[in-house]
Curated annotation (Swiss-Prot):
InterPro entries: DNA_gyrase_B_C, HATPase_C_sf, ParE_type2, Ribosomal_Su5_D2-typ_SF, Ribsml_uS5_D2-typ_fold_subgr, Topo_IIA, Topo_IIA-like_dom_sf, Topo_IIA_B. GO terms for biological process: chromosome segregation; DNA topological change. This is DNA topoisomerase 4 subunit B. Keywords: ATP-binding, DNA-binding, Isomerase, Magnesium, Metal-binding, Nucleotide-binding, Topoisomerase. Its cofactor is Mg(2+); Mn(2+); Ca(2+).
Length: 663
């Protein structure tokens, strides 16, 4: 990288003030839930990654401290410690003025994940306290802040050093992050591991010093994104070794790695200056366009596609593909769509990636002739399967019209009276008996009931054409009415929420997993929009007394049960619910369907790589990885079933009191 870039006090450029951050934190970090909390860490880590990205330093240490604060330390150049042109110490400017940083000037960084990066100042604004320690020019400097960004000390010189780098320690403000200020090791782990995959020379250490949670992990990958693709494909049957190529065009560096597996869905992970672009963008478009064009040219050259044959569709070519596309774009060309970094808008990136892939991929296909021919045949089979499923797809897309009538006539769906798709809810209910209670107990205005009577197919192992043959899944597709797979359009959904309601036993849990696998693989935008939920019926019913003095209570956990038992004293009757059908309509409404009193679990995808790997482990063909995961993560005891509430990763929402910034 360009080491002549001048990272000095004058390269820090002030764009605007910081006043609104504490008042409207969601505008700056997306939310104040678990995602927003961890986003604070990523902002500081990304500053350290920018140093490595530009050739300065190669180590980042992240430590969750005993008191719940977190430290991020690098061995880069260290923040500038002089006086800024505004008259304040530069460190104070960086931590108290929004959008103040080297990435906004012309000189601090050649490339960065910046532009909309809110950085250190927002982290400071949303912290109870923050401290920064800088090793630079042979000296150690220190400054502290408190109460959401107010300096509690000036920049002071503490001693001498032979090191360089920056260490930032902060404790999130619990008046902002009211749900929790506790950092999740696994959530941080996935993001930090990702950064290490993308920069070959980067070494990252993650420590947890909290009592009872002590843990340490190291991430360093000498083969970079090649190892990243292998990691994503773990547990899958791969068809060849990982292919990699890189190049430069239009001043943009391009790195690509890919590998095909025997499954039917694609997984493309794209990055810009080490920042994940989960909504894709121009670089991803360039990759897909070039790959489609090169594969079609090759298929015709080897005569697998005749003159009269239609070109292969990109979706067919990418069936079973896992790829990582990473680009590094100079600051002056960097452009994202919207206020987040989730979608790249730089037009030059499309032609750059297209150029590199179009230049390198043909040589790879020629060199691996036998493999390439089999990949072309695989794509042709996918095309034939897509054509076979086309009619069913179009039926699913028009689910609101013709097929909706068929579904209603079949007697399966009990629709809501309202046509307001923004408020309507669809309950997917296990079994006819529970479905009957749900129909009688629901609020007819906005709640629709779809009983699931037959076997739900495992969509992890099935092609789309086979999925359409499964009556239960087909009915769900038509009922939701927004299409499926690449045709799915969330804006066409008939329902704002899809709620899975099953018995609290192993069969019910299995149905939940099968349905979640389907939604994750074929209606992913619904999950990403936080619109898929799991209903949580009570496990116990307690009754005491008769007539007017009769008291009925419900418990969702063993802890609640113990509390109620002590509260009620002797003489109560206890019922352990094994199935939804054991509740009458009134009880089902009051405990599980009434928005005022019910408890829902919102299904969220924290990280698609981890989620995809977990689905493959639990629902794929290979038995050994599944056995190992179960032995590691599941505790077997005398109880028949374990409450889903025992899972610390589950986010429980009681009484439908949703944080507006979460929805």
């Amino acid at each position: 990288m360009n080491k002549q870039n001048n990272y000095s006090d004058d390269s820090i450029q002030v764009l605007e003030g910081l006043e609104a951050v504490r008042k409207r934190p969601g505008m700056y970090i997306g939310s104040t839930d678990k995602r927003g909390l961890h986003h604070l860490v990523y902002e500081i880590v990304d500053n350290s990654v920018d140093e490595v990205l530009n050739g300065y330093g190669n180590e980042i240490d992240v430590t969750i401290n005993k008191d719940g604060s977190i430290s991020i330390e690098d061995n880069g150049r260290g923040m500038p410690t002089g006086i800024h042109k505004s008259g304040k110490p530069t460190v104070e400017v960086i931590f108290t003025v929004l959008h103040a940083g080297g990435k906004f000037g012309q000189g601090g960084y050649k490339t960065s994940g910046g532009l909309h990066g809110v950085g250190a100042s927002v982290v400071n604004a949303l912290s109870e306290w923050l401290e920064v320690e800088i090793h630079r020019d042979g000296n150690i400097y220190h400054q502290s802040f408190k109460n959401g960004g107010s300096p509690s000390s000036g920049l002071v010189k503490k001693g001498k050093t032979k090191k360089t780098g920056t260490k930032v320690t902060f404790k999130p403000d619990d008046t902002i992050f009211k749900a929790s200020t506790s950092f999740n090791f696994d959530v941080l782990s996935e993001r930090l591991q990702e950064s290490a995959f993308l920069l070959k020379n980067l070494k990252i250490t993650l420590n947890d010093l909290r009592s009872g949670k002590e843990r340490q992990e190291h991430y360093h990958y000498e083969e970079g994104i090649k190892e990243f693709v292998s990691y994503v494909n773990e547990g899958k049957e791969v068809l060849h070794d990982v292919a990699t190529f890189s190049g430069e065009a239009n001043g943009i560096e391009v790195d690509v790695a890919f590998q095909y597996n025997d499954q039917y869905s694609e997984s493309i992970l794209s990055f810009v200056n080490n920042v994940r672009t989960k909504d894709g963008g121009t670089h991803e478009v360039g990759f897909k366009t070039a790959m489609t064009r090169v594969f079609n040219d090759y298929a015709r050259r080897i005569n697998e596609l005749k003159t009269k044959d239609k070109n292969l569709d990109g979706n067919d070519i990418r069936e079973g593909l896992t790829a990582v596309v990473s680009v590094r774009i100079p600051e002056e060309l960097l452009q994202f769509e919207g206020q987040t970094k989730s979608k790249l808008g730089t037009s030059e990136a499309r032609s750059a990636v297209d150029s590199v892939v179009a230049d390198k991929l043909p040589f790879y296909l020629e060199e691996k002739g036998q493999l390439s021919k089999s990949l072309v045949k695989k794509a042709i089979k996918a095309q034939q399967a897509r054509e076979a499923a086309r009619k069913a797809r179009e039926d699913a897309r028009s689910g609101k019209k013709n097929k909706r009538k068929d579904t209603l006539l079949s007697g399966k769906l009990t629709p809501a009276q309202s046509k307001n798709t923004e408020k309507n809810e669809l309950y997917l209910v296990e079994g006819d008996s529970a479905g009957g209670s749900a129909k009688l107990g629901r609020d007819r205005k906005f709640q629709a009931i779809l009983p699931l009577r037959g076997k739900v197919i495992n969509t992890e192992k099935a092609r789309l054409e086979d999925i359409f043959k499964n009556e239960e899944i087909n009915t769900i597709i038509h009922t939701i009415g927004a299409g499926v797979g690449t045709d799915f359009k969330i804006e066409d959904s008939n329902y704002n929420r899809v709620i899975i309601m099953t018995d609290a036993d192993t069969d019910g849990a299995h149905i939940q997993v099968l349905l979640l696998t389907f939604f994750f693989k074929y209606m992913k935008p619904l999950v990403q929009a936080d619109r898929v939920f799991i209903a949580l019926p009570p496990l116990y019913k307690l009754e005491k007394g008769k007539g007017k003095t009769k008291r009925v209570e419900y418990a969702w956990t063993d802890e609640e049960l113990n509390k109620l038992q002590k509260e009620l004293g002797k003489g109560f009757t206890l019922q352990r619910y094994k199935g939804l059908g054991e509740m009458n309509p009134e009880q089902l409404w009051e405990t599980t369907m009434n928005p005022e009193t019910r408890t829902l679990i919102r299904v969220q995808v924290e990280d698609e790589v981890r989620s995809s790997k977990r689905v493959t482990t639990l629902m794929g063909d290979k038995v050994q990885p599944r056995r190992e995961w179960i032995e590691k993560h599941v505790e077997f005891g005398m109880q028949e079933d374990q409450s889903i509430l025992d899972n610390s990763e589950v986010q429980v929402l009681e009484n439908d009191q949703f944080d507006e910034e979460e929805i």
